[in-house]
């Protein structure tokens, strides 16, 4: 069954909702954004997450030192890296890694050392999907996440199109820029039970 990552959580209530609804991954954004949390805030929120739900830290062009500090302080299970990725960034990390790839039309999939790939829209967090026809995942070495403009109305179609390891959502479960607990529940319900949306 396709796994679900709910990203950009910053409150106890949102974390508890995502966990109780059946999220497999909880994402904390450490890169500058409206969803950014500090290591200290994430460490407190991480206490609410059971061990079978994986904690993911989201970074943009980080150093290895930054990753190691966050892994240690927050107890991250995975790091997700956007932007520049040094050749040795993922070597011998004490947790698993996800490299984000912006799908921008050239169809290029990097030769990555990461454990997972995540395919996202050209502007991450924008709520806009990428053109699914521009991505060919045939023969990929790694399991992959699909992100970029997913919501309760299109996520089942995305799963049918790509058969991904997991789907990732942030703005698609928000209302007016805040996490919407009902949208979180409905999104996870759609993924887990294959209930198509209205569009």
Curated annotation (Swiss-Prot):
It is an enzyme of class 5 (isomerase). Its EC number is 5.3.1.24. InterPro entries: Aldolase_TIM (IPR013785), PRAI_dom (IPR001240), RibuloseP-bd_barrel (IPR011060), TrpF_fam (IPR044643). The gene is trpF. The keyword Amino-acid biosynthesis applies. This is N-(5'-phosphoribosyl)anthranilate isomerase. It comes from the Bacteria. It holds the Pfam family PRAI. It catalyses: N-(5-phospho-beta-D-ribosyl)anthranilate = 1-(2-carboxyphenylamino)-1-deoxy-D-ribulose 5-phosphate. Pathway: Amino-acid biosynthesis; L-tryptophan biosynthesis; L-tryptophan from chorismate: step 3/5. HAMAP family: PRAI. GO terms for molecular function: phosphoribosylanthranilate isomerase activity. GO terms for biological process: L-tryptophan biosynthetic process.
């Amino acid at each position: 069954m396709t796994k679900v990552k709910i990203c950009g959580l910053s409150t106890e209530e949102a974390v508890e909702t995502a966990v109780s609804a059946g999220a497999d991954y909880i994402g904390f954004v450490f890169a500058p954004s409206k969803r950014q949390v500090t290591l200290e805030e994430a460490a407190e929120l991480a206490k609410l997450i059971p061990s079978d739900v994986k904690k993911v830290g989201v970074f943009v062009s980080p150093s290895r030192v930054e990753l190691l500090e966050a892994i240690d302080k927050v107890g991250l299970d995975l790091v997700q890296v956007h932007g520049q990725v040094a050749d040795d960034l993922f070597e011998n990390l004490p947790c698993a890694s996800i490299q984000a790839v912006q799908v921008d039309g050239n169809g290029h999939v990097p030769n990555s050392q990461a454990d997972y790939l995540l395919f996202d829209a050209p502007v991450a967090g924008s709520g806009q999907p990428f053109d699914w026809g521009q991505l060919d995942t045939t023969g990929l070495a790694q399991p992959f996440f699909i992100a970029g403009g997913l919501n309760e109305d299109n996520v089942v179609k995305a799963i049918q199109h790509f058969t991904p390891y997991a789907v990732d959502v942030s703005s698609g479960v928000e209302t007016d820029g805040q996490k919407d607990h009902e949208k979180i529940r409905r999104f996870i319900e759609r993924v887990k039970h294959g209930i198509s949306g209205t569009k």
